[in-house]
């Protein structure tokens, strides 16, 4: 090793950065400190690694103020293959999956049944509400294995990230007196009991936070008649305001919400009167609410009439096969609307997406373009919902489709569970395909 000895007086300028933590998880901006020293150096000519500390990035509330991305359709993004993997591994029994992202990464959520599939406890898991159900959370694309985190106790849920921490809304308890727990940054901050004593429930997809205020739609009351829907405004887990539903929507459940700065917009399920989907507009600043229905005459719920006879006047439920339904989504694109729905008009089979020209602005619009098949009509689908991803220049809309397997339709087995497939908006070109669950029911544990 060569050694060079240098004896001299020099002035060194070191740019050091201090990163002092303050209360409430705030981070002091890094400030340079100039240090001057007179030194004598012995320099060893060898390989040297110099490491510098990088200050943590200042966490900020999300505001979602960028424009919506212009898209031509949707491209495949993720598929977890949970049911296929359950044939030979310990995978949770789940339903009601959804996706939500923090500023750096996307996660998949689902309501577990307190059991894996190859387990006798999986018998009769067709039931929605039991005390053993918990909200599961994994990085998107990671199936719900035994090491999966159970975020909270819940048979109905919603989750969203405000830019600083996760908020989870978790409903559990008796049908006639359930409790909603509000968990922020891993801590229980607030709670609310049932207000109509008839299955308090929430979105089964992501809530939305703008400038630190998160909003979630909750319903308590009849699933096939008049119910009491309220919109909650939450700051760091604390309920700060509750607004009643107003406008012309008659029945609102299982909303799929997205940021439409400075407001939040939701597309929901009318389980009483309409196969056209209700819209709920939420003003974050003044807590005001308005509602109506998607104008497209190609309606989004299941069951529904055939496309020739289906209708929507933008304001009222269409009174066409309104009783029963399925969670779904749509989003506005100028005067047009992008939407997804089952291919079957009668059952949760197949899945398609398309754009309806003037479907957001003109009653009974039926001009369809850019149709894509996500799941072919011979395979089962289920719930679907929206989530938003902020990129450098715009906000992209993505959706997931629940792929239900087992009971009631597949009576060889005693369980009911699901996997998930996810697509995101693209401005590029795309091909064709079908992405069903893919499990051979004869290979599965009974």
From Swiss-Prot:
Region entry Head of neuraminidase, spans: 68-446
Active-site positions on this chain: 128, 383
Compartments, record wording: Virion membrane; Host apical cell membrane
Regulation: Inhibited by the neuraminidase inhibitors zanamivir (Relenza) and oseltamivir (Tamiflu). These drugs interfere with the release of progeny virus from infected cells and are effective against all influenza strains. Resistance to neuraminidase inhibitors is quite rare.
Membrane-spanning intervals of the chain: none
Cofactor field: Ca(2+)
Residue numbers binding Ca(2+): 270, 274, 301
Glycosylation sites (chain numbering): 38, 47, 63, 123, 177, 211, 379
Biased composition (Polar residues): 308-320
S-S bridge residues: 69-394, 101-106, 160-207, 209-214, 255-268, 257-266, 295-314, 398-424
Catalytic activity: Hydrolysis of alpha-(2->3)-, alpha-(2->6)-, alpha-(2->8)- glycosidic linkages of terminal sialic acid residues in oligosaccharides, glycoproteins, glycolipids, colominic acid and synthetic substrates
A biological-process GO annotation: viral budding from plasma membrane
Pfam families tied to this protein: Neur (PF00064)
Chain positions recorded as substrate binding sites: 95, 129, 253-254, 269, 348
Protein modification: N-glycosylated.
Entry's free-text remark on domains: Intact N-terminus is essential for virion morphogenesis. Possesses two apical sorting signals, one in the ectodomain, which is likely to be a glycan, and the other in the transmembrane domain. The transmembrane domain also plays a role in lipid raft association.
General function of this protein: Catalyzes the removal of terminal sialic acid residues from viral and cellular glycoconjugates. Cleaves off the terminal sialic acids on the glycosylated HA during virus budding to facilitate virus release. Additionally helps virus spread through the circulation by further removing sialic acids from the cell surface. These cleavages prevent self-aggregation and ensure the efficient spread of the progeny virus from cell to cell. Otherwise, infection would be limited to one round of replication.
Note: The influenza A genome consist of 8 RNA segments. Genetic variation of hemagglutinin and/or neuraminidase genes results in the emergence of new influenza strains. The mechanism of variation can be the result of point mutations or the result of genetic reassortment between segments of two different strains.
This protein's name: Neuraminidase
Species, as recorded: Influenza A virus (strain A/Swine/Hong Kong/127/1982 H3N2)
